[in-house]
């Protein structure tokens, strides 16, 4: 039974905003079509103009190949003031629409995808079906994907270490993207098939994502030393742009998509830890003090009874969540539970990133050792690693989910470290990756959010996705194939659209322009929301 909930001012605002964008984009495409079919007149000076336009289009194509829509729209968009651009858009000025046709297309596609989300999850146009777990089928599908990936996408990389210039490749980008990819597939299959027996493994995967947040952000800020407002804004856009519109269009709380607020929080904490007194980051004692301070903050907020509620209480409007199936729980219960499980692991990621150059030097020295000594050391490392992993598996992993969750915040670093050691103990392992999983690893945020609405179904605001989207009723495997294909395609497009629109609206080196865009966004959204609110009040 579908319960779309009451129409909200946010949903009306979205429609009022997206309709003019659709109209503007369609009109711009019509203008471009007319322009391309203008016949050339013999011996006319207009031909020179047409040829110039063709040359400009070739330049635009070159820009497209070099960086997507990164350069052209954003530069053109700011040649005049925000106010002038809005007036030109509302008046449907031909030259403006032609200049920004690519941006209008991206915004229209993004809006159309969100409407598709609503149709799939909040209407009865498409059906739903129940989840069914079969261990044999679950393992068959996952192992089959690994085999296909290994046969078709195994690649060897020749990247050099930025530290030493040698091919060490310890925890390289290809490897971490692959890591995210194979974990994400299991995470999604866990939801689709309701594979409750791997619950503890899923907790480790989420901890690994948070570990990467600490590792990746620390590595960037420590090396690049870029704490600019633009970088911060781009980071927040990447994490929250898509999910914000999902919350608006589908009338969901932010915490329904708990991965997003978790990563936002821990990203902010890494940013704050390295950004404060950043000029002293090269001093080891200062960095030790900063990492200790991170542990202390986490301890005070999560370990001391009552401190969490006091600190986060004012943000209940943003981080609060009530599961319709569990209405008696406190609004901050979900945030406390989710953030608490991985409260320390992001700091472990920071520590690993800090010592990353040191470990690379050790590995470099090890590779230069004589063969017998090198093999002996590697054999000892692998033996100890496997032994530690086995003890953890027997003593911690095999606990029931409630008991396991009690130990998880303090032990999740163990399986992560075991995986890192085993994945990197030979040069051959470090230099290869499965690019299919790496490709999936790049769109983990989009696949995580999209699964709620176009792969699974919740059927109500703030509902957990307890059902499967059914496009082909009565044929569960064919339905799985079709919905998965659409779901992955849409997720990839959302990844590209998010980055495309980021380049348009979040400039990299112009804080004044960034601030103007921010103010313009508020100036457009606020009247739309107020007008929508009044419309709904009149209707009711």
UniProtKB/Swiss-Prot annotation:
So which tissues is this one expressed in? Expressed in cells undergoing secondary wall thickeningin a SND1-dependent manner, such as xylem cells and interfascicular fibers. Mostly expressed in the middle and bottom parts of the inflorescence stems. Mainly observed in the more mature parts of inflorescence stems, but present ubiquitously.
Q: Where in the cell is it found?
A: Golgi apparatus membrane
Biological processes annotated in GO: plant-type secondary cell wall biogenesis; xylan acetylation; xylan biosynthetic process; xylan metabolic process
Q: Which domain of life is it from?
A: Eukaryota
State the GO CC annotations.
Golgi apparatus; Golgi membrane
Keywords from the named record: Glycoprotein, Golgi apparatus, Membrane, Oxidoreductase, Phosphoprotein, Transferase, Transmembrane, Transmembrane helix
Q: Where would one find the signal peptide in this protein?
A: none
The answer to keyword Phosphoprotein applying to this record is yes
User: What does a knockout show?
Assistant: No visible phenotype on cell wall acetylation in single mutant. Severe growth phenotypes (e.g. dwarf and abnormal flower organs) associated with reduction in the secondary wall thickening and the stem mechanical strength in the quadruple mutant rwa1 rwa2 rwa3 rwa4 and characterized by reduced xylan acetylation and altered ratio of non-methylated to methylated glucuronic acid side chains. Absence of interfascicular fibers and xylem cells differentiation. The triple mutants rwa1 rwa2 rwa3, rwa1 rwa3 rwa4 and rwa1 rwa2 rwa4 are also dwarfs with abnormal morphology.
Q: What is its EC number?
A: 2.3.1.-
Q: Which residues carry this modification: Phosphoserine?
A: 44
Q: Which GO terms describe its molecular function?
A: oxidoreductase activity; transferase activity
Give the glycosylated residues: 79, 424
Q: How does it sit in the membrane?
A: Multi-pass membrane protein
Q: What is the recorded function of this protein according to its Swiss-Prot or TrEMBL entry?
A: Probable O-acetyltransferase involved in the acetylation of xylan during secondary wall biosynthesis.
The family classification in the record reads:
Belongs to the PC-esterase family. CASD1 subfamily.
UniProt name for this protein: Protein REDUCED WALL ACETYLATION 1
User: To which species is this protein native?
Assistant: Arabidopsis thaliana (Mouse-ear cress)
């Amino acid at each position: 039974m579908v319960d779309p909930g009451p129409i909200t001012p946010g949903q009306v605002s979205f429609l009022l905003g997206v309709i003019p964008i659709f109209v503007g984009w369609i009109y711009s495409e019509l203008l471009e079509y007319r322009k391309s079919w203008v016949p050339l007149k013999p011996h006319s000076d207009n031909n020179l103009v047409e040829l110039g336009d063709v040359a400009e289009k070739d330049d635009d194509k070159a820009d497209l190949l070099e960086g997507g829509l990164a350069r052209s729209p954003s530069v053109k968009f700011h040649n005049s003031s925000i106010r002038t651009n809005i007036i030109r858009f509302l008046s449907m000025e031909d030259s403006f629409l032609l200049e920004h046709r690519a941006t209008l297309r991206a915004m229209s596609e993004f809006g159309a995808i969100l409407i598709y989300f609503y149709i799939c999850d909040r209407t009865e146009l498409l059906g739903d079906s129940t989840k069914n777990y079969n261990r044999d089928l679950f393992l068959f599908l996952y192992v089959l994907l690994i085999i296909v990936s290994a046969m078709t996408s195994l690649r060897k990389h020749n990247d050099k270490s930025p530290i030493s210039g040698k091919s060490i490749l310890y925890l390289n980008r290809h490897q971490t993207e692959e890591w995210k990819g194979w974990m994400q597939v299991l995470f999604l299959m866990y939801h689709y098939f309701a594979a409750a027996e791997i619950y503890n493994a899923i907790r480790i995967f989420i901890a690994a994502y948070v570990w990467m947040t600490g590792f990746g952000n620390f590595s960037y800020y420590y090396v690049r030393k870029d704490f600019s407002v633009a970088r911060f804004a781009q980071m927040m856009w990447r994490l929250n742009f898509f999910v914000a519109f999902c919350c608006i269009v589908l009338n969901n709380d932010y915490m329904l998509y708990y991965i997003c607020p978790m990563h936002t929080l821990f990203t902010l904490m890494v940013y704050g830890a390295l950004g404060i007194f950043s000029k002293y980051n090269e001093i080891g004692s200062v960095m030790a003090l900063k990492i200790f301070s991170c542990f202390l903050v986490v301890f005070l907020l999560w370990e001391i009874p009552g401190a969490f509620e006091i600190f986060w209480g004012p943000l209940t409007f943003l981080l609060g969540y009530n599961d319709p199936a569990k209405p008696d729980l406190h609004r901050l219960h979900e945030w406390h539970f989710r953030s608490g499980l991985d409260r320390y692991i992001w700091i472990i990621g920071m520590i690993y990133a800090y010592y990353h150059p040191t470990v690379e030097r050790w590995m470099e020295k090890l590779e230069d050792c004589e063969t017998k000594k090198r093999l002996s050391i590697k054999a000892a490392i692998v033996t100890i690693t496997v032994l530690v992993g086995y003890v953890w598996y027997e003593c911690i992993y095999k606990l029931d989910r409630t008991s396991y969750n009690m130990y998880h915040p303090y032990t999740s670093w163990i399986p992560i470290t075991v995986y890192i050691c085993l994945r990197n103990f030979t040069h051959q392992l470090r230099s290869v990756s499965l690019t299919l999983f790496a490709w999936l690893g790049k769109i983990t945020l989009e696949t995580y959010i999209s699964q709620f609405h176009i792969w699974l179904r919740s059927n109500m605001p703030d509902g957990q996705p307890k059902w499967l989207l059914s496009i082909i009723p009565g044929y569960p495997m064919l339905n799985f194939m079709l919905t998965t294909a659409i779901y992955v395609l849409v997720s990839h497009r959302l990844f590209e659209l998010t980055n495309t629109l980021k380049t348009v609206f979040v400039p990299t080196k112009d804080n004044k322009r960034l601030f103007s865009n921010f103010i313009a966004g508020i100036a457009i959204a606020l009247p739309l929301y107020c007008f929508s609110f009044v419309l709904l009040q009149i209707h009711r």
